[in-house]
Amino acid sequence: MKVIIGLGNIGKEYEKTRHNAGFIAIDLLLEKYKYNSIKEEFNSLVYTSIINNQKVLFVKPLTFMNNSGLTVKQIINFYKIDLNDLIVIHDDKDLNISRIQFKKDGSSAGHNGIKSIINNLNTQDFYRLRIGINKPANQWKIVDWVLSKFSDDELNLLKESFNNKSEFINDFTNNKTFTYLMNKYN
């Protein structure tokens, strides 16, 4: 079983915001890789798909970003998921818009959702797919920037870029190594 978790904040007011890039990515993946069922469990929406004969859970935590780690820990423990079978998708202000990059372990780099996951799993050793949202201009506070909405052009660019790399799911479900994914898609 594989688990792909997209980070974001719940609520209409957060739709299409930069901090919800993980939710946007999950929605794009679900358009391409149809799901068989959806249920609410562990404070999250869990969409179940079968891809390459492999069960895949696409997850959107229903907690706020700062508490995402609680959901991730519960899912990992309940389904007995090896961390090599987990990818967390999140926004990253240090990458340009439309830049999509795989990363293995490391610090949170100030991302509160990732910080929550690290704290709850007691490890930094999990795979991430970072989605660039650009650095804010000087007049922006970081918190205001990540909660601002993408422009239509930015959103289209992000969708196009992500869709071009969404084939990573096929490689991931065919048990390709994460190093392989980084070399192929970064």
Swiss-Prot record:
<comment type="function">
    <text>Catalyzes the release of premature peptidyl moieties from peptidyl-tRNA molecules trapped in stalled 50S ribosomal subunits, and thus maintains levels of free tRNAs and 50S ribosomes.</text>
</comment>
<feature type="binding site">
    <location>
        <position position="112"/>
    </location>
    <ligand>
        <name>tRNA</name>
    </ligand>
</feature>
<feature type="site" description="Stabilizes the basic form of H active site to accept a proton">
    <location>
        <position position="91"/>
    </location>
</feature>
<dbReference type="GO" id="GO:0000049">
    <property type="term" value="F:tRNA binding"/>
</dbReference>
<dbReference type="InterPro" id="IPR036416">
    <property type="entry name" value="Pept_tRNA_hydro_sf"/>
</dbReference>
<feature type="binding site">
    <location>
        <position position="64"/>
    </location>
    <ligand>
        <name>tRNA</name>
    </ligand>
</feature>
<feature type="site" description="Discriminates between blocked and unblocked aminoacyl-tRNA">
    <location>
        <position position="9"/>
    </location>
</feature>
<dbReference type="GO" id="GO:0004045">
    <property type="term" value="F:peptidyl-tRNA hydrolase activity"/>
</dbReference>
<keyword id="KW-0694">RNA-binding</keyword>
<dbReference type="GO" id="GO:0005737">
    <property type="term" value="C:cytoplasm"/>
</dbReference>
<feature type="binding site">
    <location>
        <position position="14"/>
    </location>
    <ligand>
        <name>tRNA</name>
    </ligand>
</feature>
<protein>
    <recommendedName>
        <fullName>Peptidyl-tRNA hydrolase</fullName>
        <ecNumber>3.1.1.29</ecNumber>
    </recommendedName>
</protein>
<comment type="function">
    <text>Hydrolyzes ribosome-free peptidyl-tRNAs (with 1 or more amino acids incorporated), which drop off the ribosome during protein synthesis, or as a result of ribosome stalling.</text>
</comment>
<dbReference type="GO" id="GO:0072344">
    <property type="term" value="P:rescue of stalled ribosome"/>
</dbReference>
<dbReference type="InterPro" id="IPR018171">
    <property type="entry name" value="Pept_tRNA_hydro_CS"/>
</dbReference>
<dbReference type="GO" id="GO:0006515">
    <property type="term" value="P:protein quality control for misfolded or incompletely synthesized proteins"/>
</dbReference>
<comment type="subunit">
    <text>Monomer.</text>
</comment>
<feature type="binding site">
    <location>
        <position position="66"/>
    </location>
    <ligand>
        <name>tRNA</name>
    </ligand>
</feature>
<dbReference type="Pfam" id="PF01195">
    <property type="entry name" value="Pept_tRNA_hydro"/>
</dbReference>
<dbReference type="InterPro" id="IPR001328">
    <property type="entry name" value="Pept_tRNA_hydro"/>
</dbReference>
<keyword id="KW-0963">Cytoplasm</keyword>
<keyword id="KW-0378">Hydrolase</keyword>
<comment type="similarity">
    <text>Belongs to the PTH family.</text>
</comment>
<keyword id="KW-0820">tRNA-binding</keyword>
<feature type="active site" description="Proton acceptor">
    <location>
        <position position="19"/>
    </location>
</feature>
